[in-house]
Amino acid sequence: MAHKFLIKKNKAGEFVAYFVYNSETIFWTEGYASKASAKNAIESIKKNGPEAEIDDQTD
């Protein structure tokens, strides 16, 4: 599989969820105090992301 979510700890000791595609980080979340919160963030992205609109503010 070329894409996946990773959970890592940042320098502050917080749990951060990363979305990685072909070994390249595409985006990451804020830091969370618990691993469970980072997992909840991943589930929210998976559930709500496919229906998210694109808001192009470049024009």
Swiss-Prot record:
Spans traversing the lipid bilayer: none
InterPro entries with a match to the protein in the record: DUF1508, YegP-like_sf
Organism domain of life: Bacteria
Family: Belongs to the UPF0339 family.
Protein name per UniProt: UPF0339 protein CC_2965
Natural source organism: Caulobacter vibrioides (strain ATCC 19089 / CIP 103742 / CB 15)
